[in-house]
């Protein structure tokens, strides 16, 4: 919060930009260390020694070996960082001295109000008050907490999750928005020097134009699917410009599907828009928090599945079912379908390693339940993942000769054949019904008008989706089915969050130390149709407790030709 106030008040000055634009110095780089002889600063320790210590600490943190960071290493890294701080202060003082020598005074920037707007202040106040209420009576020591108290502690820490993520994204947004086009050439999250080429042919039901731009050679991390904005000087409205459809670094072209309001704008530069307002998600999470504060974690209703996910409870099933999830010799897809039918306001986690058929299994479950008249929703961290599952549902429907309607709430882009694209939340929620599958991100399912609209919500790639997102979307459905693999990369996060609140949904279910789901937690897809036995053995032992096995016939997979990777690779 202190950092946010300083940034809002524009209290930070980029000394590197000041030096680069205001001085001419006989050095190759205008970095802090290269300027130290100029300003007369001398470090206490040799940079070569402290640099080696810093690398050693970074390695220890990367491999989670914090015990390797002894007092000597810590002291050397602290000395390295202290030297950087003192060097920056010395540079600032040197620049101020040069300023005082000038024949005329240079005006300083006007003070800017550092207080948040009234809506933001009210938002922060509500989060803080509810967090304090949830934490009342919860021991500070984790070892002293009951399971319910730990769940309340996690929920309290997650109430501000989206606010913290949003802050970090806004800081970067305003920094990039204020840069000159030439400066954006050096930013990997941008592309500059744009020259409009023309409009590309529209496809399918595409309602907005896609424009191609040419740009000079530069490094950029922009990828298809990224939303982009123009600089403030090129787009005074400061709103979303469009999203990247394709980018060709060799040809130097970028194709951007524009928003309607930006169809006639042709800016000199674009940068990655990483601010995604999570108003609906935050509101849903706050509603869940208020429910827990008022009624606890064991009340039936639209928050039951969310409570079970937060508390890491085994699948809640109808009375009369046995505690055994998968029966001896039972086919995995049949077991999963039976368990879905038995769910009674609970959560069914399904962990699938590489090539184990997560999407295949999920699609057959979706098809069977939708064909039985259940109201089915699908969500994931991206539209691409949602479309992939919806396409597999279509293939499964074709194999079974079953008619299933598939609807995807998108941002207006083209969708694969057979999938209806709708652009409004009202259209998407209005499509929910028997023999219809509706896909949308967590933003759709977290809305107030989506509450209790579904019998089942399938969360694909739940090993990537943040727990906070999954909890926010959970109130849309009576039951949750989590598909994914906690061993794969999680969704990137920007903010600093309390321990345990910044994990993916399936990682949370699994727990900190476990590699695979226990038999009483959910289903583990233990066969791979992709990995050669030699690769499978290694992968299974290192990542999956030795539980993953290849199906027969994969031993015939081989690389041939003059390569050192001949055979299994």
PLM features: residue spans?
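Conserved helicase motor core of SF1/SF2 NTP-dependent helicases
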Residues: 371-373, 380-392, 433, 437, ...
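Active-site-proximal helix-loop-helix substrate-binding element of RNase H-like nuclease domains
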Residues: 2-6, 10-82
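Generic, well-ordered alpha-helical scaffold segments in large soluble proteins
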Residues: 1, 18, 22, 35-42, ...
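Short beta-strand-centered aromatic/proline hotspots
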Residues: 236-249
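Accessory interdomain/linker segments of ATP-dependent helicases and helicase-like nucleic-acid enzymes
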Residues: 106-224, 231-236, 569
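Mixed-charge, glycine-rich, non-catalytic linkers/tails in nucleic-acid processing enzymes
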Residues: 54, 58-138
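A generic structural motif
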Residues: 210-215, 249-264
């Amino acid at each position: 919060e202190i950092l946010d106030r300083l940034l809002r008040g524009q209290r930070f000055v980029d000394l590197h930009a000041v030096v680069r634009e205001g001085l001419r110095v006989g050095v190759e780089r205008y970095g802090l260390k290269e300027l130290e002889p100029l300003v007369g600063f001398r470090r206490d320790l040799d940079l070569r020694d402290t640099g080696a210590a810093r690398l050693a600490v970074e390695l220890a943190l990367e491999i989670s070996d914090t015990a390797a960071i002894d007092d000597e290493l810590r002291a050397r890294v602290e000395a390295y960082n202290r030297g950087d701080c003192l060097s920056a202060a010395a540079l600032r003082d040197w620049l101020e001295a040069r300023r005082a020598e000038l024949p005329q005074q240079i005006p300083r920037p006007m003070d800017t109000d550092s207080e948040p707007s009234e809506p933001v202040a009210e938002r922060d106040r509500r989060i803080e008050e509810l967090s304090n209420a949830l934490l009342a009576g919860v021991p500070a020591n984790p070892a002293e907490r009951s399971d319910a108290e730990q769940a309340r502690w996690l929920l309290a820490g997650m109430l501000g999750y989206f606010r913290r993520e949003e802050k970090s994204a806004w800081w970067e947004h305003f920094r990039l928005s204020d840069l000159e086009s030439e400066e954006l050439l050096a930013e990997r999250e941008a592309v500059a020097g744009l020259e409009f080429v023309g409009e590309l042919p529209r496809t399918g039901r595409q309602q907005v134009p896609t424009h191609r731009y040419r740009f000079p050679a530069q490094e950029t991390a922009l990828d298809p699917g990224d939303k982009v904005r123009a600089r403030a000087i090129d787009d005074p409205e400061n709103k979303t410009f469009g999203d990247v459809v394709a980018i060709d670094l060799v040809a130097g072209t970028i194709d951007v599907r524009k928003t309607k309001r930006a169809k006639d704008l042709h800016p000199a530069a674009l940068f990655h828009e990483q601010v995604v307002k999570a108003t609906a998600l935050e509101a849903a999470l706050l509603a869940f928090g208020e429910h827990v504060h008022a009624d606890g974690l064991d009340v039936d209703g639209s928050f039951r599945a969310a409570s079970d996910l937060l508390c890491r409870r085994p699948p809640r099933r109808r009375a009369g079912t046995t505690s055994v999830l998968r029966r001896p010799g039972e086919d995995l897809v049949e077991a999963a379908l039976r368990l879905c039918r038995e769910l009674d306001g609970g959560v069914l986690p399904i962990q699938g390693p590489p090539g184990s058929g997560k999407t295949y299994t999920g699609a057959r479950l979706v098809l069977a339940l939708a064909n039985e008249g259940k109201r089915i929703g699908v969500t994931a961290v991206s539209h691409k993942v949602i479309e992939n599952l919806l396409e597999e549902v279509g293939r499964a429907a074709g194999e079974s000769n079953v008619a299933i309607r598939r609807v995807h709430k998108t941002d207006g882009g083209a969708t694969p054949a057979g999938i209806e694209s709708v652009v409004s939340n009202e259209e998407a929620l209005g499509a929910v019904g028997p023999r219809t599958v509706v896909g949308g991100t967590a933003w759709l399912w977290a809305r107030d008008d989506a509450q209790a609209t579904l019998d089942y919500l399938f969360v694909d790639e739940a090993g990537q989706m943040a727990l906070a997102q999954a909890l926010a979307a959970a109130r849309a459905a009576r039951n949750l089915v989590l598909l994914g693999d906690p061993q794969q990369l999680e969704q990137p996060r920007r903010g600093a969050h309390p321990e345990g609140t910044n994990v993916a949904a399936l990682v949370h279910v699994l727990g900190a130390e476990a590699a695979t789901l226990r038999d009483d937690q959910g289903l583990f897809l233990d066969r791979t149709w992709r990995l050669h036995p030699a690769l499978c053995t290694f992968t299974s032992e290192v990542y999956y407790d030795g539980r993953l096995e290849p199906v027969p016939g994969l031993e015939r997979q081989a690389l041939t030709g003059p390569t050192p990777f001949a055979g299994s690779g």
